[in-house]
Amino acid sequence: MTRQHLWVLLVVAGSLVAGAADGHPLQGFLYGTVETLSKQEYTGVIRWGKEESFWDDHFNSVKENLPYQKYLPEGQRGRRRKLIEIFGKDVDVAWEGDYAARQFVARFGDIVSIEPAGKERADVHLKGGSVERVNGGSNDIGNEITIYDESLGEMKVPWERIDKVTFRSTPSNVDVTARRLSGDVTTVAGEFSGFIQWDSDECLSTDKLDGESEDGKMSIPFGKIRSIAREGAHSRVKLADGRDLTLFGSNDVDESIRGILVEDPRYGRVKIGWKAFEQVTFRESRDTGRAYEDYPAPHEIRGTVRDTDGHVHTGRIAIDLDEAYTWEFLNGSRADIDYLIPLESVRSIEPQRRGSLVVLRGGAQLDLREGKDVSDESDGALIWTRETMKTYLAWDHVQRIDLD
């Protein structure tokens, strides 16, 4: 797919300094220092691989350490291997021994640093002090990263040359001419608004929509597009100059699209499939999202679990014998729309006959039908009622989970 590179559009005004003024328009861009094995340091705006550019973008891999899986009854264990897609990325999820490997997903804003520990491994240091060893699973591991250093300009650093990447607040004097895509997406399930990644990839006004018209192939910068609507197996594209086009022949404009990602503040990140998609209307904005310092240090999940026998268990919780911190996510789907919800935003989870009713702290309610965290595929809940006492509940014994 054709992509005009972001970094040729970066202009650095003056000296780059650590720290950022509160609320400046460029605060959402990834920024930090790359230390290499040759003891050199490069500081500037970062693009991870060819996709992630903002603090609310996700670093994906697979967890190597599974401290809670030993509480799963032996009869519920098994050896399997599966390739799943998580918001546009293929993640290889394997079962090691008797335990299911688990996906690692964290926003870059929740990460202090990433240290490669081999070709397919890394240590991810999170705000709050915890460290997760991750192992392969997506192209976020083992891929090169691009940094725009103030003295050198654009530099691509191969994974095998990286010693450590340390993140820090984005300075206000970094000038990026490209805008972050944002707008409103209408679907069969209603409207979603926020920052947009088209085809789980294009996120900037300089990125291009590829397709064919009756007159030939086209590659249109998103900054020139007003709206895109699904029209059967094709797309109706309306340009800012008023022209209408019907495009086909690429995964940007037909049913082979890898999904439309929307960072909707009500839910977190949603992925909209072609069948659910109706139309997107873009809006011009210089906003790039939350600043690095706007992501607080995470903490353990605590709350109350009521079981189907009426007993109440209060304490620290590991949902699905996996998610135990506020930086982690609850995932579920319905009507060709996937939701990846930060657990810090979840108020309660109530298992239903099919899926779960999830209530968010902002008041929104979601009836999610698919996804390991919300269905009968869940490995249940582990509750530390005291530091020395743990209670395990299978998912079909959980009536409701309320988070503090």
Where do the protein language model's features map onto the residues?
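Compositionally biased alpha-helical segments
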Residues: 22-404
